[in-house]
C-alpha cells in the first residue's frame, strides 16, 4: 500500500515507514497550507495526474494524517491522532486478514469522520485497489437495493445496524444478494444467528474488538458466533487481560503492587503494552490532541517498574480455547438491590423485542435509594407500537427481577452517535425526569405484570415492591 501511494516519479519507494527518527521531523506547514482551501474544489480540479511532489515534501509516515473523534457514547468525544503510518498499516493488515482483492466492492454508509469508515474500510479498499460505494447516510430501506445494484461484496457494521436491518419486514429476496463479508463490532450472538438464518449462511463475519485510538485489537477469523477473536499465543502479542474489581472500581494487585493476569473465563480489563520504537507501527499509542486526555489512558508500572500500558476500559474474558468474548464497559455495570447488573447483558436479553429498533440500558439514581435502578431507552420501528405487558413478560422471563429495567423511556427522535448508538451519558443525566426527557416514561409494576405510565404514585408503588 505504501508503495502504491508512492508511484510518483523520483520518489524512493524503498524507504521504510520511519525514514526519520521521531524527534527529527521536517516541518509540514507547506503541506497543511495547501489543504487549507476548499478540499472538494481542489479534488474536483484534479485531472487524474500525480499531485506535485512539493505538496508532500517533508511529510513522513509518523506525521499526523487526520484526527478522528471518539464516538462519545459514554462521555465527550476526544480527537484521536491518526498518523499516516497507522492509516497505511490498517489497510495493509485488513486486506490480508479479510482476503480482499481488487474484485471486491465496499459499501460505506458510515460517516467518514468515524474510524471504521476513514481507516479500516477506506484504507483497506485502497490497499487492494477495490471499489467503494459511499452513501451519505445509512438507510434501512435502501441498504439491500444498494447491495444488489452495485454488486457490493463487503460492508462494515457498527452499533445497531444489523438490528435495524433485521427489524424490516422479511421478503422473498432476502437471500438474493452479492454481500459475502462483513466486519465490525457489537454483534450479539442472538442477532448474529438471526442474521445468517435470514440472509444466508454465506457470510464471513469478522467480529472484532478495538477502538479508534487503541494500540491492540482482536478479530474473529473463523465465525465463532459471539466471539470477538482468538489469541492462540499471548506471549506474541502486546494484549493482556488483567484482573479488575468492579465493585471497588480498581485493579487487583499482588503483594508487590503489580497487576495480575485474569484467569480462564475471568473478566479482565484489556490493556495493550505501548511500543514506541522507530520502525515499528504496531503497538504505538498516538493518543489525543490533549496531552492530559492521553495520559489518562496510560497505566505505568503494570507488571514491572517502568513499563507503560494503554487501558481500554473494556472487560473481556478468554475461554480455554483462547477465544475472547466482550463482557462490558467498565462503569457500565451498576448496582441495584445489592446486586451487580451488566447493562450489556440486559440489552442483549431484550434486544429481540418485537418492533424494536434500538435499545440502550443504563443505571439511574433514585432519591432515597442506594445504587442505581435500571432504565431502558427504546427506539421502536416506525409504525410499531410499544406493548408494555409483552416487554414486562420478556424482561421477567429472561432476567432476574433486580436486573429487569425499572424504567422504560420511549424515544421518537433519538440522539445517536456517529456509530448509531444512543448517547448514554446524556440519557443518564436526564434519568426519569419527565421535564428533561419530554418522552413517554414507564415504570415496572410487578403486581399488574406490566409497565405503567410513570407518575409519583406509580413510582412509589414500584419502589415498595
Features from the language model and the residues they span:
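AMP-binding/adenylate-forming catalytic domain of the ANL superfamily
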Residues: 20, 399-422, 439-463
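Conserved beta-loop-beta connector loops within the AMP-binding
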Residues: 240-275, 279-284, 384-388
Amino acid at each position: 500500500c505504501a508503495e502504491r501511494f508512492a508511484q510518483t516519479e523520483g520518489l524512493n519507494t524503498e524507504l521504510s515507514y520511519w525514514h526519520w527518527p521521531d524527534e527529527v521531523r521536517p516541518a509540514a506547514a507547506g503541506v497543511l497550507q495547501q489543504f487549507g482551501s476548499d478540499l472538494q474544489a481542489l479534488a474536483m480540479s484534479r485531472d487524474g495526474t500525480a499531485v506535485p511532489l512539493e505538496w508532500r515534501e517533508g511529510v513522513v509516515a509518523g506525521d499526523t494524517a487526520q484526527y478522528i473523534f471518539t464516538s462519545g457514547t459514554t462521555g465527550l468525544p476526544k480527537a484521536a491522532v491518526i498518523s499516516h503510518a497507522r492509516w497505511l498499516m490498517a489497510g495493509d493488515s485488513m486486506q490480508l486478514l479479510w482476503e480482499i482483492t481488487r474484485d471486491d466492492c465496499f459499501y460505506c454508509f458510515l460517516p467518514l469522520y468515524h474510524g471504521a469508515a476513514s481507516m479500516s474500510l477506506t484504507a483497506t479498499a485502497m490497499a487492494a485497489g477495490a471499489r467503494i460505494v459511499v452513501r451519505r447516510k445509512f438507510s434501512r430501506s435502501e441498504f439491500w437495493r444498494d447491495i444488489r445494484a452495485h454488486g457490493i461484496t463487503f460492508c462494515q457494521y457498527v452499533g445497531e445496524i444489523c438490528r435495524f436491518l433485521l427489524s424490516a419486514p422479511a421478503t422473498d429476496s432476502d437471500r438474493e444478494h452479492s454481500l459475502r463479508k462483513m466486519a465490525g463490532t457489537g454483534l450479539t450472538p442472538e442477532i448474529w444467528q438471526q442474521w445468517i438464518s435470514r440472509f444466508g449462511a454465506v457470510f464471513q463475519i469478522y467480529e472484532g474488538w478495538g477502538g479508534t485510538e487503541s494500540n491492540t485489537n482482536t478479530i474473529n477469523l473463523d465465525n465463532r458466533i459471539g466471539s470477538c477473536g482468538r489469541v492462540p499465543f499471548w506471549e506474541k502479542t502486546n494484549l493482556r487481560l488483567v484482573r479488575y474489581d468492579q465493585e471497588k472500581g480498581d485493579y487487583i494487585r499482588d503483594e508487590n503492587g503489580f497487576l495480575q493476569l485474569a484467569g480462564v473465563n475471568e473478566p479482565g480489563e484489556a490493556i495493550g503494552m505501548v511500543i514506541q520504537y522507530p520502525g515499528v507501527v504496531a503497538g504505538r499509542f498516538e493518543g489525543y490532541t490533549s496531552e492530559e486526555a492521553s495520559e489518562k489512558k496510560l497505566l505505568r508500572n503494570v507488571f514491572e517498574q517502568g513499563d507503560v500500558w494503554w487501558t481500554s476500559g473494556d472487560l473481556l474474558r478468554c475461554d480455554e480455547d483462547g477465544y475472547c468474548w466482550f463482557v462490558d464497559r467498565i462503569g457500565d455495570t451498576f448496582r441495584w438491590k445489592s446486586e451487580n447488573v451488566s447493562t450489556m447483558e440486559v440489552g442483549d436479553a431484550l434486544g429481540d423485542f418485537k418492533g424494536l429498533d434500538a435499545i440502550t440500558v443504563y443505571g439511574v439514581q433514585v432519591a432515597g435509594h442506594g445504587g442505581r435502578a435500571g432504565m431502558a431507552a427504546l427506539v421502536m420501528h416506525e409504525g410499531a407500537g410499544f406493548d408494555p405487558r409483552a416487554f414486562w413478560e420478556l424482561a421477567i422471563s429472561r432476567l432476574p427481577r433486580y436486573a429487569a429495567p425499572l424504567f422504560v423511556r420511549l424515544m421518537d427522535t433519538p440522539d445517536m452517535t456517529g456509530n448509531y448508538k444512543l448517547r448514554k451519558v446524556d440519557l443518564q443525566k436526564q434519568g426519569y425526569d419527565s421535564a428533561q426527557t419530554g418522552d413517554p416514561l414507564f415504570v415496572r409494576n410487578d403486581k399488574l405484570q406490566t409497565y405503567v405510565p410513570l407518575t409519583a404514585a406509580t413510582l412509589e408503588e414500584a419502589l415498595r415492591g
